[in-house]
């Protein structure tokens, strides 16, 4: 039998405590010592009916409770509702409301809540339950007086009540009606910032953006520096699809109120979403100053430092995360392995990867060790390690096939890499990951026809796969004369992932191929500012050279090549234009 959520003895002691118990000829008064520790409902004695507990009422109480214990909820609801009507006891009506809500019987719950509110008109809890049930049943006009009464009697809790209105009203489908109701409820409180906040949030839900902005601004004016109002205003601005405007607002707010940590955290995350990594790291570092032992913020700064190739800082922050008791230490060890691998410190990377003992990163860490073995001219050892790893599901089979193909691609054995991926597709049919990787191998084999076929299949399988559109568009721009088609594909990728620096780079490259040099320079400069990648530097230099800015192009290539001496794209650009 499933354990009921309705405690049996505690309910009866609460209900029977103040009344005379009569069973046959015997009667006795329950004392406080007979009750357990369950607190009494807050019911004024003035609202308790002066009645004795008859055998019939006692039987019904027992029946209702035992029915609830045995999950016969309809019987329990009906019995409690009968008792609520006949006894006039608000505690019984409260119980009837609770059981009816749990039983998902809105009609009975609403009737019980009405009785409860009538029987104990001073009860805020009764009003809250009744108003919530009325809202859930779409009866906003009937709920309004109860909500008004709750607010008028709340005293210092009026502000918090306005802040909770959204959760109460969110379930109602007619958002315009909710916005109108909140406007009416807020009118008597022209100086209360929470009232303006509630109006702004309801207007936002209703799509009334101008009204939402105005109300959020009013909330800020009534309580300057209030972070909740600022965050809501930023959320409203985000509906305008203008990330720069949102960033500008948060930046201005933080200039005025630099201690606003909640706003700074949202701003930092927004910068990460927009791929503005240097600015994001700066904000997370400011957050970290106020909470230096927070492992999540420390990890964020470490990963952003790694993204920006500030390896020394990344090492310091990631090592610190391990000392702060981070909940997923193997994840941090994996990141440290990546950090050393990016610096071609194979021994250091293998040491960190080898310390990953469990979790999602276990197989991934061994795959990275295999890749590093291959890069040290130990290809067969690397492949043997991969083949020894367990593949317990489709995801792991996919990852292992990808890793094996990567080893072969790294030594330019593209045909065998193609074969491995094709074999993987027989095991995991229609894997968009394997199809995408096979397309990249096809490009190395100069088989643009195979690349296009695989990428179009990826797009068919996953229409939101931004990188498939980007890869196909870039290849068509770089390797064919199908520039208009390439532009259309890349614009689709930009729409799906507007802040991705590599997709922005592709857009700049197709603009260059179309002869739109000014557009190309602006776009590629944006991409490079977001991510100073060597291939982006190579493309931007090509555009600068074509514009006659040969010295600027050469300086850019040389600086980027110094930081990325293994870049084939930069080496080719320098050899072509400076020798």
Across the structure, where does each feature detected by a protein language model lie?
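Bacterial N-terminal signal peptides that target proteins for export
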Residues: 2-12
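Bacterial N-terminal signal peptides
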Residues: 12-22
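Short, intrinsically disordered, low-complexity terminal segments
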Residues: 20-25, 64
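Cleaved targeting-peptide boundary
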Residues: 25-40
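Alpha-solenoid helical repeat scaffolds
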Residues: 30, 45-72, 76-579
């Amino acid at each position: 039998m499933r354990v009921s959520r309705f405690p049996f003895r505690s309910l009866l002691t609460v209900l029977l405590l103040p009344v005379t118990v009569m069973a046959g000829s015997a009667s006795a008064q329950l004392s406080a010592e007979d009750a357990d520790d369950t607190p009494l409902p807050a019911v004024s004695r003035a609202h308790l009916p002066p009645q004795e507990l008859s055998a019939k009422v006692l039987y019904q109480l027992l029946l209702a409770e035992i029915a609830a214990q045995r999950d016969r909820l309809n019987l329990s609801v009906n019995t409690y509702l009968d008792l609520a009507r006949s006894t006039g006891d608000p505690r019984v009506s409260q119980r009837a409301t609770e059981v009816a809500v749990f039983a998902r019987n809105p009609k009975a719950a609403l009737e019980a809540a009405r009785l409860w509110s009538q029987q104990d008109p001073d009860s805020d809890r009764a009003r809250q339950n009744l108003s919530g049930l009325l809202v859930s049943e779409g009866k906003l006009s009937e709920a309004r007086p109860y909500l008004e009464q709750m607010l008028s009697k709340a005293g210092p809790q009026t502000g918090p009540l306005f802040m909770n209105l959204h959760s109460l009203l969110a379930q109602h489908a007619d958002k315009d009606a909710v916005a109108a109701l909140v406007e009416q409820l807020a009118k008597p409180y022209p100086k209360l910032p929470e009232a303006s906040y509630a109006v702004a949030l309801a207007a936002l839900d209703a799509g009334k953006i101008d009204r939402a902005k105005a109300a959020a601004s009013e909330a800020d004016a009534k309580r300057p520096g209030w972070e909740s109002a600022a965050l809501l205003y930023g959320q409203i601005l985000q509906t305008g699809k203008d990330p720069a405007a949102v960033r500008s607002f948060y930046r201005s707010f933080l200039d005025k109120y630099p201690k606003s940590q909640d706003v700074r955290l949202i701003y930092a995350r927004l910068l990460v979403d927009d791929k503005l990594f240097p600015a994001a790291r700066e904000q997370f570092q400011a957050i970290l100053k106020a909470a230096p032992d927070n492992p999540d913020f420390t990890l964020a700064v470490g990963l952003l430092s790694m993204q920006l190739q500030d390896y020394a800082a990344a090492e310091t922050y990631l090592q610190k995360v391990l000392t702060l008791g981070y909940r997923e230490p193997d994840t941090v060890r994996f990141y440290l392995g990546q950090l050393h691998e990016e610096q071609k410190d194979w021994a250091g990377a293998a040491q960190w990867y080898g310390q990953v003992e469990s979790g999602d990163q276990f197989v991934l860490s061994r795959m990275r060790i295999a890749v590093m073995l291959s890069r040290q001219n130990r290809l067969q050892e690397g492949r043997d390690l991969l083949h020894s790893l367990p593949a317990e599901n489709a995801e792991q089979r996919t990852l292992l096939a990808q890793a094996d193909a990567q080893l072969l691609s790294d030594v330019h054995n593209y045909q065998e890499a193609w074969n491995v991926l094709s074999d993987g597709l027989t095991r995991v049919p229609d894997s968009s990951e394997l199809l995408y990787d096979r397309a990249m191998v096809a490009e190395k084999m100069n088989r643009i026809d195979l690349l296009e076929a695989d990428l179009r299949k990826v797009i068919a399988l996953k229409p939101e796969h931004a990188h498939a559109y980007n890869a196909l568009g870039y290849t068509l721009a770089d390797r064919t004369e199908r520039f208009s088609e390439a532009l259309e594909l890349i614009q689709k990728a930009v729409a799906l992932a507007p802040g991705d620096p590599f997709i922005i780079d592709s857009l700049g490259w197709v603009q260059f191929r179309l002869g739109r040099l000014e557009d190309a320079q602006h776009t590629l400069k944006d991409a490079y500012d977001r991510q100073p990648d060597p291939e982006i530097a190579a493309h931007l230099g090509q555009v600068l050279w074509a514009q006659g800015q040969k010295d600027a192009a050469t300086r850019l290539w040389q600086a980027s090549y110094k930081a990325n001496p293994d870049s084939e794209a930069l080496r080719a650009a320098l050899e072509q234009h400076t020798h």
